[in-house]
From Swiss-Prot:
GO molecular function: cyclin-dependent protein serine/threonine kinase regulator activity
The family this protein is said to belong to: Belongs to the cyclin family. Cyclin AB subfamily.
GO terms, biological process: cell division; G1/S transition of mitotic cell cycle; traversing start control point of mitotic cell cycle
Family annotation (Gene3D superfamilies): Cyclin-like
Gene of this entry: nimE
Keywords, in A-Z order: Cell cycle, Cell division, Cyclin, Mitosis
Official protein name in the record: G2/mitotic-specific cyclin-B
Matches recorded under SMART domains: CYCLIN, Cyclin_C
Length: 478
């Protein structure tokens, strides 16, 4: 065969064949050297020959013998990290490349930490957010466990807080007890100076408030009407006066005017009727004109004269109302200096610590004096004191002490007569519907209902006779 023939079959020249060709005397030594044999292909457990993949595992471990390799790994793991050479060198292992790699691998196996793998910079969409949430939840769990491990200290703190609160409550109790003992030690005629609280408020005029109310008490005697003026009114009766005032209360409520306006209007009517004779058909005109004058005197924005003409069902023209206004003012000599009972009620309410319920009932009881002619002979300060006394009695607010008597200006004995007249009016059947409905609303705390219920139960303690007839049946001479 020609060796240079490129189309001929190529023969493989191995190292053994090359050695045989180069040997000059192969039989000189008497024994021929065996040629180097090629490495046998690895066979599997079934004896079949297995080919190694081009880029497969270098360790020649295939799928067929996974069990054998696992057993081998288990055996090597049992022996530990120290090799035979390490044992012979007295426990000091010589550092070599293989040893370094093995030591690093062993250290990695023994010191595996989950956060170390999570600390790598993740790519987009690698789920790093969930890993961070997991670590934060682990931290919160650790904090919870730390908090659960500290109950004794917290219990001690809570006990200290409870002890401090108990001490504070005991101190408050001691202060209250001391205040109560001081109140008990005070004499019964002790009068508290309540005006010193208003020294910094210029609107209260605390420096000369005493002189102001002394002047009002002098002035109220000058503005009292004649309690018997009905005697020289041939066409009028007390019943008609009550009907007129009840209608004026309805007008006053519709226009939403001040309480002072209503009291001044009724006082103007009584003072004018004490000086002039009025026919029955002109009585309503006197009432409308008096309300018009009072609204001008007390209100910031008073209703127009046309409004008063309208509420009177156009019975009187605007000119008639204006003419009546001029005539009334001329008769009274333009004297509108009327000491309103609301001023006295506010003065007494200061000693009552401005209790809103007591004050509302007091306003209702004071307005009784507008409808009942029997109150015409009493000054407004006495009516205000009696109203406050009865309101406190109904609400059970305590006795009429020296402080209340000082700021009211009347003792219990001095207001007893007016007080009994109020109980008498409350005990009788209702005859002034507008007045009763006004104070039966929630705005006025249902004062008319409450006071009448009280009078029905306790009237026998303060008035002698059990009155059943309505107020309108009272004779003029009573």
């Amino acid at each position: 065969m020609n060796e240079n023939d490129e189309n001929g079959p190529s023969t493989r020249l191995t190292r053994a064949k090359a050695a045989a060709l180069t040997t000059d005397a192969p039989a000189a030594n008497g024994a021929l050297k065996k040629p180097l044999q090629t490495k046998k292909a690895a066979t599997g457990a079934n004896g079949t020959q297995r080919k190694r993949a081009a880029l497969g595992d270098v360790s020649n471990v295939g799928k067929a013998d996974n069990g054998e390799t696992k057993d081998a790994k288990k055996a090597t793991s049992k022996t530990g990290l120290t090799s035979k050479a390490t044992m012979q060198s007295g426990g000091v292992q010589k550092l070599s490349r293989s040893n370094l790699s093995r030591t690093a691998v062993g250290a990695k196996d023994n010191n595996v930490k989950k956060p170390a793998t999570e600390a790598k910079r993740p790519g987009s969409g690698s789920g790093m957010g969930s890993a961070m949430k997991r670590t934060s939840s682990q931290k919160s769990l650790q904090e919870k466990t730390i908090q659960q491990e500290e109950p004794p200290r917290k219990k001690v703190d809570i006990e200290k807080v409870v002890e401090k609160q108990a001490e504070a409550v005991s101190v408050k109790g001691d202060v209250k007890a001391g205040a109560q003992t001081e109140e008990l030690e005070k004499p019964q005629d002790f009068v508290a100076d309540l005006d010193t609280e208003d020294l910094d408020d210029p609107l209260m005029a605390a420096e000369y408030v005493v002189e102001i109310f002394d002047y009002l008490r002098e002035l109220e005697m000058e503005t009292l009407p004649n309690p018997d003026y009905i005697d020289h009114q041939p066409d009028l009766e007390w019943k008609m006066r009550g009907i007129l005032v009840d209608w004026l209360i309805e007008v006053h409520t519709r226009f939403r005017l001040l309480p002072e306006t209503l009291f001044l209007a009724v006082n103007i009517i009584d003072r004018f009727l004490s000086a002039e004779v009025v026919a029955l058909d002109r009585l309503q005109l006197v009432g409308v004109a008096a309300m018009f004058i009072a609204s001008k005197y007390e209100e910031v924005l008073s209703p127009h004269v046309a409004n008063f003409s309208h509420v009177a069902d156009e019975t009187f023209s605007d000119k008639e109302i204006l003419d009546a206004e001029r005539h009334i003012l001329a008769t009274l000599e333009y004297n509108m200096s009327y000491p309103n009972p609301m001023n006295f009620l506010r003065r007494i309410s200061k000693a009552d610590n401005y209790d809103i319920q007591t004050r509302t009932l007091g306003k209702y009881l004071m307005e009784i004096s507008l409808l009942d002619h029997r109150f015409l002979g009493y000054p407004q300060s006495q009516i205000g004191a009696a109203a406050m006394y009865l309101a406190r009695l109904i609400l059970d607010r305590g006795p009429w002490d020296a402080t209340l008597a000082h700021y009211a200006g009347y003792t219990e004995e001095e207001i007893d007569e007016v007080f009994r007249l109020m109980v008498d009016y409350l005990h009788r059947p209702v005859c002034h519907e507008a007045f009763f409905k006004k104070y039966a609303s929630k705005k006025f705390l249902k004062a008319s209902i409450m006071t009448r219920q009280w009078a029905k139960k306790y009237h026998h303690l303060y008035i002698d006779s059990a009155l059943t007839e309505p107020y309108n049946s009272i004779k003029d001479n009573e």
